[in-house]
């Protein structure tokens, strides 16, 4: 059944309405413990006014995160686009007939729970709290059974902190945060085709790099004979992988995705000729390229070379790699390389060299504070990183670093790090103070993929 012209189904409407009315409740002083909106209606509790409501509040992003976390096991066809959820929170969904279907503002009217917008990405709803364990005794049995069937949840209890947190994906192969909001597109009715969402609750573009890697791997397996040419090694060069006459992916080539080869002058010339001859069929390497293809490509490259480069000892490149031994250094050279000088130019020359972790920038606004902290190599997954803010403005960051190892394995080789300037791996704790007192409840964090942790927090009214 469709509730309006854009195709919102009754199941989709039922789920969003059930979650917002049973997992949220007004912050009424007399309700101890706090009750959900549906529970108050079922129990016939007296109405409340602004004088009875506490100072608790939730951001719109947290409400969206709550919706997606509760429906983490549901079918993707039942999930709504964040824009649709935002319209529901505002009471703007064009449901027909009008007034028959309650929306968020029916349970939390704006005259008692005002929605204030501090910035384009920071909007709060005042006077509401999360109910982590809804009382099922006050829920209609048919509605409860329908919700359990659609959400695939047997237990309605949730974790208060996790339910309001964004569902972050971590790409373990690169140890970087991937903001893969979805692997499909939102349809016209606002249905999302995946279950992964980013920290702001807003759906981003599909993870193009991940799709591209799959396309490249398929292209390599299906048509290996078209890949006999040399693959570009330089980072930043963009190529197009074409499969069955259609362009599949355009990505950035990374040095670490290939074995280390020595560039020969004739190789560079041959690359230019082959690129002109087979435009659109060159493949950019990815970490998902099959190992057997890389070995085949490696053997074919040296086999097809009409002239093998030799060093002064008469060893070819293949022979040198087979008999790869450490190059002896004189004691003077070792001493000179023990403490290399670091020369910086451009904007980097204006920075003060020091620890790579813990550099802080703080911004001040009339209503809020903004800070950025450099945390390169810090784990982002749950349980490994935490941020606590006290009312006096003290910020405490705790986590663990993954860089600075003594031995590093790259390209089937083990390197012993003689010079180590990065922070060693292990737990750390970082504390700094904001210029004034703040309201810890009104905090919007964001851990960026480039290793910068930033946050916006509302200042205390009296500060």
Swiss-Prot record:
The UniProt keyword set, sorted, is: Nucleus, Transcription, Transcription regulation
Q: Where in the cell is it found?
A: Nucleus
Asked if the Swiss-Prot or TrEMBL record annotates the protein with the keyword Transcription, the reply is yes
Where is the region Disordered? Answer: 169-199, 300-347
**Up-regulation conditions:** Not regulated by heat.
Q: How does it assemble?
A: Interacts with MBD7 (via C-terminus), IDM1 and IDM2. Part of a complex made of MBD7, IDM1, IDM2 and IDM3.
**What is the official name of this protein in its record?**
Increased DNA methylation 3
